[in-house]
A protein has these predicted regions:
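Bacterial N-terminal signal peptides that target proteins for export
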Residues: 2-11
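General secondary-structure edge motif
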Residues: 3, 129, 133, 137, ...
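C-terminal motif of bacterial Sec signal peptides marking the signal peptidase cleavage site
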Residues: 19-22
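A short acidic-Thr-Gly-centered motif at the start of a beta-strand
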Residues: 24-26, 740
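Feature for extracytoplasmic/surface-facing segments of secreted or surface-associated proteins
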Residues: 26-195
Length: 883
């Protein structure tokens, strides 16, 4: 080739390149293009095709998570990508500016392509891909369309998200949840409108549309808060009757579930404890008795949420009171406390939200009363009614997931056993509690817009009620409170404006060098994971309880407490010469492990009513064990008075939705120690093989402790073999649920009782407060109010079976309501939040079982400006709590 020809060829090549560049074309780089294809769910194992500016095509296949990589060598830009998912055909435009960056394909990139190309339908977009008319689009036009989509999403959220074209994210799959960026894909629909985008209502991807139901209640015969029972009915010691106890209707189960869950969270046992005077359905938002029976009319919508396999799912519910004002919308989350079902927070966050005209977003967070009777192969459905497991399929609230052969073999070896959802789902649902709470908020926005928005000519409903114009408070008590805190940590979309919680079960990831002081005393052990301190308490509480005279519920442990002391001494875990010395030593061990003198008299009732059950459920859930694993020799079953296993009657399962708390023993299902001497027996009556004593299954308790620590608690030897493998699973599960305390500057209130024996403040509230203050630094807006003479179970206070709670303790629920009021005023009106403080209450006193009426003088308010002697301070890594 002569020089003249080479120069002419070069000139033509440069001119061609300039022409291609002017219309967005040009040679692509040899680097691979990569990204994620999703439509809420990952578009897995699907063909993704790229067409270039001159009609060349190249294809690749996405992996199981929707990820792809495509070599662009030789292709001319712009490219148009196309992939077919279960919901449609999706496209993305890629320019030279996108090389080296993530290039996703999803419903958002499809919308961007529509606007960039000036098209009005999906069919037109597919035609553009086929005929190549996209070749004229410029990189600037694509970027402009993407910016307009982000403008619309910012108007929706109140904060600008990352570009869904290029953000790296984790989509949901059939058996795992996606991250918050993935949730945004189906939080709201978008479509081009003029030079920008309109947003419209969309059912979130994770919600099962075929499970969705909605019911309106008139506020008279039935209602949202009291199920038609009113203040008087909730106060009755007699639960509502069933027309046929063997087959209650869904409406009857709902009424009984509301009755039992309300009374389980607040003290409604007697009017002397504050019900009907300080709190309750009849008390208005100003604290006055003006609401009569307190029934609240409105809409209730409910659905399953989770993966498509049905293995990992939670229940979501939204209650919208008739007083809801769409011009001033508000949402309160009410994630269930404990392992309770969907109505588990009805009496706490539910009541507060409904009275304030807010929609209430509930979730059972993947626990609840999911019972599988393995002998009869029956399960409960979403509404609590009973069905055969095969008939229910994945719509069962929970199924153990055993094949017929596996179930038959297990039934033969361990007859009449029960599988329970929180313990045996093999999903470790606690890792998703924050996400479940955020899903409940997203579901609330969907329900509200379905109710209040008006469809346009296309039949779609523009978003009227959005995160940007809605006040959202994450709230609840106990496990629900921990879920609210985790939701706030995970909230990348700005759905939550503030947090106000009570007695949170929250597990700090690490305190590091942080210290906690009460008065002048440094707490020796703090910030331990839940199962760590529970397995420790499970060893020593029965014996320690004997050191505290006048303990409420002491009679419940009388049959095994002394034997527990004796057995611990025999194993070298106590050294006292007699029972009294052993009990004192056991109590000292609890003091050294995070409990304090405020808890001494409550250890008896807690071991009798809570500790072993929580140990067994959480041991199973953290290790993702099956019911067939019988971890540490424990199982669930109905038992006879002598403690032997007996068949569970159909009536037990028929009513479990209403009476169960999600953690056996509950509703007729007890905790059984399979390995007891003489055969399987209820745990509190079990004789341990290694001791020969009826010591409430100490051998099982020691096994549980070993799985948490990784070593034998008696010999100190490291675990090996099967026990080591089980321990590694349990400890991995614990790591999955720990919090990092990064609240991102969200205003947050934590209210806890100093006398909380179940979730000691040194391990939870105090520890989390210190860690979060350290993590967020100057940006922290976390406030902590510690209430003296208050604890975890308000329902114990005036319980006839626990005299002495009433004389010693005040209802923490009063301060939960105050915390909610403070947060609401802060978010709505800019009112200042009081500084962290100790609130010093006065117990009612009097005679155990008949304490005098409580009054406002027993319950001073959270002070706007606390006295110096009551101020809680955090400085230089030390949390200082006044004595």
């Amino acid at each position: 080739m002569d020089k003249h020809f080479r120069l002419r060829a070069l000139t033509l090549a440069v001119s061609g390149a300039l022409i291609l560049a002017a219309c967005g074309g040009g040679e692509g780089s040899a680097s691979a293009l990569s990204g994620t294809a999703a439509e809420g769910l990952a578009i897995a194992n699907a063909t993704l095709t790229a067409r270039d500016a001159v009609g060349n095509t190249r294809s690749t296949t996405t992996d199981a998570s929707g990820n792809y990589s495509l070599d662009t060598a030789g292709l001319r830009f712009p490219l148009m990508l196309q992939i077919t998912g279960s919901k449609g055909v999706w496209h993305a435009l890629v320019s030279t500016d996108d090389t080296g960056r993530t290039a996703n394909v999803n419903n958002a990139t499809d919308s961007v392509a529509l606007l960039a190309l000036g098209l009005g339908s999906s069919a037109a977009l597919q035609n553009a891909f086929t005929n190549g008319s996209f070749r004229e689009v410029s990189a600037a036009r694509i970027a402009e369309a993407d910016a307009r989509l982000l403008d619309a999403l910012e108007q929706e959220l109140g904060t600008r998200p990352a570009s869904l074209r290029s953000a790296r994210f984790t989509p949901a799959t059939d058996d795992s949840p996606g991250d918050e960026t993935d949730r945004l894909l189906t939080l709201v629909g978008t479509r081009p409108q003029g030079a920008g985008f309109a947003t419209y209502n969309l059912m979130p991807e994770n919600v099962w549309a075929d499970s969705y139901t909605a019911q309106t209640y008139d506020g008279s015969s039935d209602d949202l808060l009291t199920a038609g029972l009113g203040k008087t009915g909730l106060a009755s010691a007699t639960a509502p009757a069933y027309a046929n106890a063997a087959a209650p209707t869904a409406a009857e189960l709902r009424r009984n579930a509301i009755y039992n869950n309300y009374r389980a969270l607040v003290d409604a046992n007697k009017g002397t404890g504050g019900y009907g005077s300080l709190y309750g359905p009849n008390i208005d938002t100003r604290g006055a008795d003006t609401l009569g029976e307190g029934k609240i009319a409105g809409l209730e919508a409910i659905a399953y949420s989770g993966d498509r396999s049905g293995k990992r799912k939670a229940v979501l519910m939204v209650q919208v009171p008739a007083s809801f004002n769409p011009a001033q919308p508000c949402i309160v989350t009410a994630t269930s406390s404990g392992s309770r079902g969907i109505y588990g927070a009805i009496g706490t966050a539910g009541e507060w939200g409904l009275k304030h005209g807010c929609a209430v977003a509930y979730t059972d967070k993947g626990s609840g009363n999911g019972m599988h009777d393995l002998a009869r192969d029956t399960v409960n459905l979403l509404d609590g009614t009973v069905a055969g497991a095969s008939q229910a399929g994945k719509h069962a609230h929970f199924s153990a997931g055993l094949s017929a052969t596996e179930r038959d073999a297990f039934n033969q070896s361990f007859p009449s056993r029960i599988a329970y959802k929180h313990a045996h789902s093999r999903q470790n649902p606690e890792r998703d509690w924050g996400r479940n709470t955020l899903d409940a908020v997203a579901f609330a926005f969907y329900v509200l817009n379905e109710k209040y928005a008006t469809a346009d000519a296309s039949g779609k409903k523009p978003r009227l009620i959005r995160p940007a114009n809605t006040l959202v408070i994450a709230s609840s008590a106990s496990n629900g409170a921990g879920a609210a805190l985790m939701a706030a940590e995970q909230d990348k979309l700005g759905l939550i404006d503030g947090v106000a919680v009570s007695e949170p079960q929250i597990q700090p990831k690490s305190l590091g060098s942080l210290a906690i002081k009460q008065g002048s005393t440094t707490v020796s052990t703090a910030g331990k994971p839940l199962l760590d301190y529970f397995t420790y308490a499970n060893l020593y509480q029965p014996c320690a309880a004997l050191a505290a005279t006048g303990s409420p519920g002491a009679a419940f442990i009388a049959g095994y407490a002394t034997n527990r002391c004796t057995a611990l001494k025999a194993k070298g875990l106590l050294s006292g010469a007699d029972t009294a010395a052993q009990a004192t030593e056991a109590l000292q061990k609890l003091h050294a492990y995070g409990w304090s003198a405020e808890h001494d008299v409550f250890h008896a009732s807690h071991h009798a009513l809570a500790t072993p059950s929580i140990v067994v459920t959480y041991l199973n859930t953290y290790g993702r064990f099956s019911v067939t694993d019988n971890v540490c020799g424990f199982s669930f079953a109905t038992t006879a008075p002598a403690g032997t296993v007996t068949a569970t009657s159909a009536a037990v399962q028929a009513g479990i939705f209403a009476v169960g708390n999600g953690v056996p023993p509950t509703g007729g299902i007890n905790l059984v120690y399979n390995d007891a001497s003489g055969g399987a027996k209820r745990d509190v009556l079990a004789v341990s093989p290694s001791t020969g004593l009826a010591d409430a299954a100490l051998d099982g308790a020691l096994c549980a402790r070993a799985l948490v620590t990784g070593s034998d608690p008696v010999s100190g030897a490291a675990l090996t073999g099967t026990l080591l493998a089980q321990s590694e699973r349990v400890r991995q599960g614990i790591r999955e649920v720990q919090a990092d305390g990064r609240l991102g500057g969200k205003p947050t209130i934590i209210v806890s009782g100093r006398s909380d024996t179940l979730i000691p403040v040194n391990h939870a509230s105090r520890a989390y407060y210190a860690m979060s203050r350290q993590a967020d630094g100057a940006a922290s807006r976390l406030h902590y109010y510690e209430v003296t003479n208050a604890q975890h179970f308000d329902a114990f206070i005036d319980n006839a079976a626990l005299p002495g709670y009433d004389t010693r303790l005040v209802p923490l629920h009063v301060y939960f309501n105050q915390g909610m009021d403070l947060m609401y005023a802060h978010l709505k009106n800019g009112a200042a939040l009081p500084a962290s403080q100790v609130v010093r209450t006065t117990p009612r006193g009097g005679t155990a079982g008949s304490a005098p009426d409580i009054s406002a003088t027993n319950l001073p308010p959270i002070a706007a400006t606390p006295a110096g002697a009551d101020s809680i301070a955090f400085s230089n890594g030390v949390l200082a709590v006044p004595e």
